[in-house]
Amino acid sequence: MADVPKREVENVEFVFEVMGSPGEGIDAVDLGDALRALNLNPTLALIEKLGGTKKRNEKKIKLDEFLPIYSQVKKEKEQGCYEDFIECLKLYDKEENGTMLLAELQHALLALGESLDDEQVETLFADCMDPEDDEGFIPYSQFVQRLMSDPVVFD
């Protein structure tokens, strides 16, 4: 706890109040969501490595167990930031005007990296996407801003 500033500990405690049960901690299946609520972007592999589970009620993570995890993820270099995502999406911006085809974004989310499933992509688009224009293009910077500012919850 020594390497986590007091203000950040307060933020972590708040996330635990919202996501967990008093004294019991948070469900390990919610580890990634808790970290993302604290403005971190861990990969699914890292979440699993740090004790995240895929099924609810397998394990609980208490606050004193979570703080070292939070500290470790905060130091991770493999997190994407806004600029990283924009640079990646610029590869699809053939006109260099801040837009890309919605179909290309959908394909990238379904097939590349830590891919999402169809339902997750639909939820993501419903929560973060501007409507496409008549030619099928969307402004990708607003999409990334919304994506990074408001966590999208997948059931």
UniProtKB/Swiss-Prot annotation:
One of its GO terms (biological process) is muscle contraction. Keywords: Motor protein, Muscle protein, Myosin, Repeat. Indirect flight muscle isoform is found only in the indirect flight muscles. The larval and adult isoform is present in the larval and adult musculature. One of its GO terms (cellular component) is muscle myosin complex. The keyword Amino-acid biosynthesis does not apply. One of its GO terms (molecular function) is myosin heavy chain binding. Pfam families: EF-hand_7. Disulfide bonds: none annotated. Residues 7-41, 80-115 form the EF-hand domain. Myosin is a hexamer of 2 heavy chains and 4 light chains. This is Myosin light chain alkali. It comes from Drosophila melanogaster. The lineage of its organism: Eukaryota, Metazoa, Ecdysozoa, Arthropoda, Hexapoda.
